[in-house]
UniProtKB/Swiss-Prot annotation:
Protein name as catalogued: Large ribosomal subunit protein bL36c
SUPFAM superfamilies reported for this sequence: Ribosomal protein L36
Statement: the UniProt record of this protein carries the keyword Cell membrane: no
Coiled-coil residue windows: none
GO biological process: translation
Pfam families, per database record: Ribosomal_L36
Cellular compartments annotated: Plastid, Chloroplast
Lineage start: Eukaryota, Rhodophyta, Bangiophyceae, Cyanidiales, Cyanidiaceae
Molecular function GO labels: structural constituent of ribosome
Length: 37
């Protein structure tokens, strides 16, 4: 899980979802997991 100020899609499978007011990137590749912190 990377914590970044700007979250971006890295590949075609990446999806940006808002969970409890936190932007997250959900992907089949675990290396692409990010959240905004």
């Amino acid at each position: 899980m990377k914590v970044r100020s700007s979250v971006k899609k890295i590949c075609a499978n990446c999806q940006i979802k808002r969970r409890h007011g936190v932007l997250r990137v959900i992907c089949s590749n675990p290396k692409h997991k990010q959240r905004q912190g």
